[in-house]
Amino acid sequence: MFKYALPLYPTMEISTESWSLTSLERINSFIEIGNQDEMIYINKDDSTKVFDEIKPMRHQILIGNMMSSRSPVDSLILMHGVGTGKTLTAILSIINNISDTEFGMKRALILTPNRAILSSFKEEVFNCCMHHYGAGFHTNVEHEVRNIINELFKFDTIRSFCNKIAIKSDEIIHKEWNASFIVIDEAHDVAPSGIDYPKLNRFMKILSTRKLLLMTATPMRNGSSDLIPLHNLMMKKQVHDISLEEFHGNYVEINRRRPPSEDGDSIVFSVETPKIAFMTKFAGLISYLPSDALRLDNVNVINVGDNTTYGGVLLSTTNIVSHNMSELMERIYSGLLNDNNNTNRRGDVALLDQRQASRFIFPDGQYGTLGYMAWMNSNTGKATLRFKRELRFGSNMETVLGAVEKFSPRYANIAKTVYECARRGEKSIVYDDLVTGSGLLVLATILEAIGMKRGSGSNRNSFVCMTREVMTVSQIVAAQRVFNSPENYDGSIISVILGSRVISEGLTFKDVQHEHVVAHWNDSETEQIIGRGIRVGSHSKLLETLNTPVTVKVYRHATIYNREPDKSVDVIMYATSEMKRKNINTITEALRSIAMTCPELESRSISRTICAFTPHEENISNVVPLHHPTIRRTFMDRLNETFNYEKDEYFVTRMENFCSAYNLNYQSDGGMRLMFILLKLIQTTPQLDINKFINCDGYFVYTTKTVDEYNSCRTLRYPFDVSYKSTKRLYYDTIVSLITEPNLIKAYETNPNYPLTKLPLHVITIILEKAISRKLLLTSDDEHQNAYHIQALDTFKQYYHIVYESGGGSNSNSATDIKAVCWLSASVAGESTKYRICVSDQNTWKDCPDDMKEQVNNIKVTKDNTTIFQMREKSLSHYGQKNPFSNDFCLRVIPQNSLSAKYDKRRIASGKKCTTWDNATLGRIKQNLGIESPLLHERTTMSRSDSCKLIESRLEEIDAVVTDVACGVQAKRK
């Protein structure tokens, strides 16, 4: 009921507060153990459909419940390994959240790095929604489900979305996107130095209410500083963002080292050690699940090749398939190393020339772009006629591969391997980040030379090039669908994928048994690529058909410069990657230790456990500090810059103002507990259509277009001390109780210490409309409405009328028929523009249009005449009116004639306040009611106030007092 009281701008986080491990355990044990097989808000019938068809795993259910509207977690880095089902985790989390129509988000916003991933995400959303929503339709199921998706889900690429919001004002962004469940897939692509990050960070700072899920298996590519943009996106105030300089100075300790090598030109790499400040800064922001925490039953992964050395140091975690350079390649490569004037030595820090030359040397000794332009058709990406002759097109495979050997031993080996695997019915993926030059398109030409066909086909000899140079996004998605189809489990339609960066993230390839990758500067890239073909459920069709375990082989290729192996660019890249991996593993272990949830790796279980780290400082032992928006000050920003809230006399005065407005006793634990519930509901519940919030005195005020004016509003802060007694523990216990006790809010709503009439009028109007809608849907067999709705319907029965009621004799046929009307706001404002109507279409409420105002006014007058007739039947001259907000009591003369629909609207419809009537009139009224003797000597002299109390009591006994919100309000009607 408090969800309409929300700020336009976000609140400031507390930076010195902490969750206790006990509180975290209560949250997680409730979500995990109490709901290990079902979502909180997806009802059992729906969840059964989802589970039967999609079979979400326990870690997916856990995250879905942690990101529900009931949970205080509003931002999370989903650091789950490749192949663990992050997409389904996100979709289930969204559906679980928005299924809570009371406090869930309004919509989902899905952002991905490119359109290929976006298309794949859309397909996953459709499949999941078909299972969840499809059963509710009998015809045009697909069309209806897509309509639901279009309403609830918005999709875009990161770059496109950032360009759109860059030209919009804060107010427009807040109105369009507040209360959204935002998912950013492959979030590590949001780089702090990129052009998208500032725009996206501004967008996140504007939203006062949102859930944010950052999905990435590899949040760090080069080091811990890659975490900075992810952290900042989760912060709701700019003041809590971390700069690169601050991060390196306060959060990690950096030491630079050089591995032992005879060559003084070896690589210098960094070793980062996280400090306690790092641990506390990221505590509670991470959900951690490595790929190997999920057992891939009957799928064995083999890394083909041997370990190599660099600078005399064994690369212990990297198996390499080595290819010795041919004589031609060595000659060209040696020239690159020895030519001191080569731009590669001066400016090509990525060693691109060496990488091109290590892949393929064209027949004339050129490589890269120059060789490609001379030997390939740059428009079609296919070989020229003279290149085909050099490759012996039309000859047998041995002849072709013999010709290829002198240009590229690596390509000859890959071509032979994938060809033989295809003939055996085993599918392959070949990945390279270089496409033109000496890259993938040259390899595609070699595959064509040995007899394989480009595009889908038959006889297990077809391949496709999934690159933007030769295929559109729609073609890539279509090819992926064919490759993953059950009919193609053995590669009978497409057996080989040649993929560039477009397939390196977010896509799934099924039933793959061979993966060929090239060297990268960081192991995260390689891990992402390998994960495209090794995922949960990715080999289900193959396992079902073969009924035997499946082996997936991973080939990490390297071309070796025989004269000086340590100067082979592939070896240098693998060595750099392994060094970065060792450094990143240290940071990953730190994140794992302070993750909100993580698996018990020892038992390979995916069940939840609290992974607490042991800090070195005694004063924060047994505590996981939490520096993120799930714990905030009150629902406003700050009291003001000069207000000293620590001084008890000022503090208590402000607390009294607030608590008085909400009928709370700030000196009792119960009153404070209810206040925390109020504040938590206000700050975490989606704002719908009303831009209003409550100021420190408990009154609703309108927001403004500028954040500066918003920040100038005086506000309260909490948790705080009351009478020198800390309420911090009470605060945390209350927040946890909101999660673990679902009926707690309803219990407080029906508590007599917090009556309905303490709410502002516009909130009561919304509650009344909701109660009427609920009553319209009820049948005699339905569970009765909740007590709060009953109170609203009974207290304000004079201000609404139900035209069509469930189970009644008449039915509403048209979607535009009026089912109910409400004029509560109009009775205060005195304007017909405040009339509200409920139409038949889904019991929706809206402002009354001009052409219906006369009809609604007739209904209102009829209701008033009914009241007058009932009072006239009691033989009364006056009847009572009671203002539920002020408790004022008024008397109104019963008119002799019925009211007309054309009566003077400028007249005040309510009676006069009882205490303003003269004693003589009050005496006559008391005589009429039989509470005063007509004999003068028997009358007692009493004050007007006492007379009014007697009259009010008597009229209540005979049911002659009605609710009137205008009673006692001296306002002119215009």
Curated annotation (Swiss-Prot):
Record's keyword annotation contains Nucleotide-binding: yes
PROSITE patterns in the record: HELICASE_ATP_BIND_1, HELICASE_CTER
Keyword annotations from UniProtKB, A to Z: ATP-binding, Helicase, Hydrolase, Nucleotide-binding
Domain Helicase C-terminal: residue ranges: 413-595
Keyword match ATP-binding: yes
Superkingdom of origin organism: Viruses
A Pfam family it matches: SNF2-rel_dom
Binding, ATP: H80, G81, V82, G83, T84, G85, K86, T87
Motif DEAH box in this chain: 185-188
UniProt-recorded Gene Ontology molecular function terms: ATP binding; ATP hydrolysis activity; RNA helicase activity
Family note: Belongs to the DEAD box helicase family. DEAH subfamily.
Name the UniProt record assigns to this protein: Putative ATP-dependent RNA helicase
Naturally occurring in which organism (per UniProt): Trichoplusia ni ascovirus 2c
